[in-house]
Amino acid sequence: MSDVSKASLPKAIFLMGPTASGKTALAIELRKVLPVELISVDSALIYRGMDIGTAKPTASELKAAPHRLLDILDPAQAYSAADFRRDALAEMAEITAAGRIPLLVGGTMLYFKALLEGLSPLPSAEPEIRARIEQQAAEQGWDVLHRQLQDIDPVAAARIHPNDPQRLSRALEVFFISGKTLTELTQTSGDALPYQVHQFAIAPASRELLHQRIEQRFHQMLASGFEAEVRALFARGDLHTDLPSIRCVGYRQMWSYIEGEISYDEMVYRGVCATRQLAKRQVTWLRGWEGVRWLDSEKPDQARNEVLQVVGAIAN
């Protein structure tokens, strides 16, 4: 698409970054001075009743700056990147029609990628193939199937943990149905996003600072009642660790503690480590991201002003 064609498209802003980087605070500040409406891009914030462990914006923050695509699902439900793209496009169209600019804020990079580049259609599930995969897993174990996936699709295998049967089964199923790997299919883009997008990433200047913020925030969550929040989910009886909601960072570790699998101290250690690993993956995505402007979260006023310099002109 030519620069002239891009300039005629409606505007949108991406505010991306690793967990605990200050994205929400900056987005709320920007909403005070720009004609923007916020859309959450977070695979954990979609779930109702999961507030503390996801660092969901507080009631007062949401009153000042409402977020769309927040609290839209029960934790028993699944939600795909394709679901997100469909819902985000609808919200963006509504915001644009009202004469305002969509500001998409979050850290689920797969959602941002799906929205920006589109998705190639994946084959629908086939119960017979899924049953065959699950039978093999029951007989030989998921570790064997994970090694099988390593031979078929090493990129997907590196991303999918052997203890994640839902995603592991789906990756194998896609290959058995289509003859193409999940990686091949997801690298084939669909319809590109019909917006002129200004992309920003916010993070501390050093990894050590980010690690400190992550550890501090995890302890703040514990002090704010995170254990009670997960115990309430556990007590429902219909949730389990195969669900995407309970596999969220922090929740999986707290669930293991509640089930008696690990000690409290081990839960804290694993929770902090898992959050740091998530942040590392997010930063790795962003370092390879084209057209992104980096902001220093340790200098919030400067970060805000940098966004305003770029976006201010298009917002008037």
Swiss-Prot record:
Residues reported to bind ATP: G17, P18, T19, A20, S21, G22, K23, T24
SUPFAM superfamilies assigned to the protein according to its UniProt record, in alphabetical order: P-loop containing nucleoside triphosphate hydrolases
UniProt KW Transferase keyword: yes
Transmembrane segments: none
GO molecular-function term, one example from the UniProt record: ATP binding
Keywords for the protein's UniProt record, in alphabetical order: ATP-binding, Magnesium, Nucleotide-binding, Transferase, tRNA processing
Family, similarity comment: Belongs to the IPP transferase family.
Complexes and interactors: Monomer.
Protein name as annotated: tRNA dimethylallyltransferase
Organism of this sequence: Citrobacter koseri (strain ATCC BAA-895 / CDC 4225-83 / SGSC4696)
